[in-house]
Amino acid sequence: MRSRSNSGVRLDGYARLVQQTILCYQNPVTGLLSASHDQKDAWVRDNIYSILAVWGLGMAYRKNADRDEDKAKAYELEQNVVKLMRGLLQCMMRQVDKVEKFKHTQSTKDSLHAKYNTATCSTVVGDDQWGHLQVDATSLFLLFLAQMTASGLRIIFTLDEVAFIQNLVFYIEAAYKVADYGMWERGDKTNQGIPELNASSVGVAKAALEAIDELDLFGAHGGRKSVIHVLPDEVEHCQSILFSMLPRASTSKEIDAGLLSIISFPAFAVEDVNLVNVTKNEIISKLQGRYGCCRFLRDGYKTPREDPHRLHYDPAELKLFENIECEWPVFWTYLIIDGIFNGDAVQVQEYREALEGILIRGKDGIHLVPELYAIPPDKVDEEYKNPHTVDRVPLGKLPHLWGQSLYILSSLLAEGFLATGEIDPLNRRFSTSVKPDVVVQVAVLAENSHIKGLLKEHGMTVQSIADVHPIRVQPGRILSHIYAKLGRNKNMKLSGRPYRHIGVLGTSKLYVIRNHIFTFTPQFTDQHHFYLALDNEMIVEMLRIELAYLCTCWRMTGRPTLTFPVTHTMLTNDGSDIHPAVLSTIRKLEDGYFGGARVKLGNLAEFLTTSFYTHLTFLDPDCDEKLFGDITDRSFSPDSEPDLGGYLEDSSPQESQDELDQYISHLLQSTSLKCYLPPLCKKSEDSHFFSAIHSTRDILSVMAKAKGLETTFFPMILPTKVLSGHRKSLNLVDSPQPLLKTTPEYDYQWPRDDHDEVDCEKLVGQLKDCSNLQDQADILYILYVMKGPRWDTNLFGQHGVTVHSLLSELYGKAGLNQEWSLIRYISGLLRKKVEVLAEACADLLSHQKQLTVGLPPEPREKTISTPLPPEELTELIYEASGQDISIAVLTQEIVVYLAMYVRAQPSLFAEMLRLRIGLIIQVMATELARSLNCSGKEASESLMNLSPFDMKSLLHHILSGKEFGVERSVRPIHSSMSSPAISIHEVGHTGATKTERSGITRLRSEMKQMNRRASADEQFFPLGQTMSNSLHSIKSVRSSTPSSPTGTSSTDSGGQHLGWGEQQGQWLRRRRLDGAINRVPVGFYQKVWKILQKCHGLSIDGYVLPSSTTQEMTPCEIKFAVHVESVLNRVSQPEYRQLLVEAIMVLTLLSDTEMDSIGGIIHVDQIVQLANQLFLQDQVSFGTTDILEKDQATGICHLFYDSAPSGAYGTMTYLTKAVASHLQELLPSSGCQMQ
């Protein structure tokens, strides 16, 4: 008989260790592992980690087999692994209804359970009796299901199980916006059942999604039906959130040792090696002790000061756990494995020796890993005084199966029985490797031959959509409908993937569906849902952003292929040429670089061999799921609205279409636009039916009379609901109400019925002859208010032509005419919502940016601190906007732009925790008033008239603090809007905008506009306006340097006019902007935490920030920063808020002094007021009393607001003097005397 090799003997020793410490807890029926002999429940996460040693040992036996018995032993061990994984699968499949609900609700009550009965696979506690929602546990199951399947194990047996796993992918793909209870099952560290977004959960979910994508769950025995599909945009969302969170673990935990599992084995979720090292160093420096690592700071679990009779902690109680947190040896096993994967022999040796020193010797000398080490109750005070000096005692489970398993696995790796690639067959360990540069392939396609010809006139040879046949081209939303079919299973009542927006990563792949190649255009070119895609400049800007995004985030083999359609909406107003912005973009694409991204422009056929393909085999003819099986239910977006249809040239004759063609045609036709309204007439001799002689307010006045309402209407940008009563006009800038100009009474000949009320039937008859956009809008608005959106007009004798459908058609016409204020208002009437609104909001929240909507103060200003379903989010925005439709729509728009910037330029949001959308909109209007030198109402109207591109540009200038210029220009001759169009431009170092520097383009445009104006009838100008005045409005009105806070003749926040010079107002403007966007100095919150430790609290605008906050929260917690923000945000004036922040910064200097205490509550307001008085005294002594106007709301001098922080007469100088005076008796006597 062959002698046993040394390696075989060692493996037998590990086999005995595994049997005696792990497998002895495995249930023979279900395969689940109980937590201990006393605790019979099986935790999902613990079971997976506990079986890893068995999996690793099985592979070690298979590789080092000396005898047939070794191969048999390997098979037995592997089947123990399969049995456990299938046991967990059975537990989850019994809760299939929860998986289905959770996909749509993401509610903690609809989540899979975190633990099950070991013997029966049934649940053990109620839905609301445990912190069940633990995304990392479900994700860990999928991650190792993928890894084990790739290693050769067969865990999934049937297609029903495949469908369930596909739905588990949908369950975890929204992890980046799901607040859960985390790997410690506690959520917020107060243990009060408050879920929070956990970096560990996001990281493991990202790893699982990447690992299982395109994996055949049947392994070598599978086929196309057993492949799992993952959308890459969901993975990238997780990556982005991880990058923004780390090294923080969550809102309440500034660091967590559990992050070791995502920066190294098993998840390897972080791609930035520097971020990996920073996170690891933070864990070691803040959490490591002599016996392992603490889970997180102020962790009270099993400490002597924890009350074992209650689950939750009181907030101030957390301070008691500082420096006595229990230390867990399991984290050293992570660090050993991390060292092995990184090839760091010193780290491996150091932690192996340290771990050997704290292992418990059990029966027969086997090594056991205890759960944790705790401070003896009688040594607590000694540990408080001298941390890490007291000898600890082991507590908890012995062995701790999770730690025991990783200890054995690390030993097998360290001793060479396993290679790193064997426990990571999917090569996740290379996540930090340098990626090659990405070249984005761009195919420009003309919608039809006419557009193709127009492009050729400019020297651009492109294909039309018909030319690329047999490649099919479809809008991106069709891909969302198709993916809604993925994962459907009638046997288990699984509906598949919820209808969701698919990002540019998803649409930049080529798809093979039923042996046909499909390419999908990106959804930012789709006008289906919201008006952003109606602005060609916005489309170009989004193309630039998405190309840069593709270059940064593309991870797949092959190149991304972006199909950019040039449609009829990208033509000039008269349809004779391509829009200049689109032409310029195509020329830049031809150069090979666009917005910093490397691109290759070409035909689709040229890209077929270099593109990345996804085979959507779940749509194959022999699959059980029928395309038309549920077409009226979940395959449609819940907020579908009519649009301009799909790419008609790509469709085939009806008789030649197969089922797939018919299905796509049905999707397109079901959302195509039907025309009922009479066509618009652009000729000058066509008169305005109403708008040429009557303003909107006149129509509303007549409506009020018809309704018997006594209302006074101020000049407005758009109509508002008459039934809402005495509502003020849209005015975002506080200013004194000007005297109303008397408007002559016109004799309106409204059609009336026998009861002398407005006859809506006759009004519909007048609509038939109305060919002016604004007139059609006026009539439809009256019908909307008086009859409601669902009223059937029977226009032209056609049944089912509701007011809603006519408004939808009008929306499309307004889009073609670029009437942005009208577009925004109709969007509000139709309750259109941005398809990506919920995702945009979740992106901001996931980047630790809370949102408020509506104008301050509370309760009008609503805070959004957790992701909300789209319908609930939209309703909250309308409620916070006071049902002001225009503001509600603009709020959605701003949220989308903020999300774009937080993804592309996160540095813009440095030191910002709460984005107050209402204040941002108000400041945008204020900035326009300053630059245009106009009144508040005019600025508000101008803001609503901005194109989406200009709105986004203005927002960027607000966020960045850069100067900008505003240019006026007349509208096209057929425009129904009387207010001049304006555009936002960047101001260069010369003080001129880019268009002014170029000059020629603008001059040509003005000459063309003047010629068109000269040939027009006078009726197209506002009443009483002369031709010379109209032409004069073309002149640019801009501010090349910062001027007064709201312009040389506009108003300040207190309603007073400021007559300052062009160079004044810079610092007031800066403070107003920083206060509106809640920007604070670097390290502000940590400094506030320190000063709170030396006083009883800070009083800000009547609200106290108590010192007890530091008992609960640590200085670097996001939770603490949010708490400070909540107090500061009670101040409604942004410039005053910023002065308070400056005063607090001066106060924080005291935290560095040797004083233990500064006394009671410090009143920050009094310090600011005292500083203002000192400033006024100096100004009076200089004889400048004529410009010392005060803010009526706060009493602060405008000149003080506008003073620079530094300098002899800067705000910091006076604030320092005020602090010294306010706290004089408490300051050290040896301190420097204030001058």
UniProtKB/Swiss-Prot annotation:
The keyword Phosphoprotein applies. The modification Phosphoserine is found at S695, S729, S735, S983, S1015, S1044. A lipid is attached at C1232 (S-farnesyl cysteine). One of its GO terms (molecular function) is calmodulin binding. GO terms for biological process: glycogen metabolic process. It is found in: Cell membrane. Gene3D superfamilies: 1.50.10.10. Phosphorylase b kinase catalyzes the phosphorylation of serine in certain substrates, including troponin I. The alpha chain may bind calmodulin. This is Phosphorylase b kinase regulatory subunit alpha, liver isoform. It comes from Mus musculus (Mouse). The gene is Phka2.
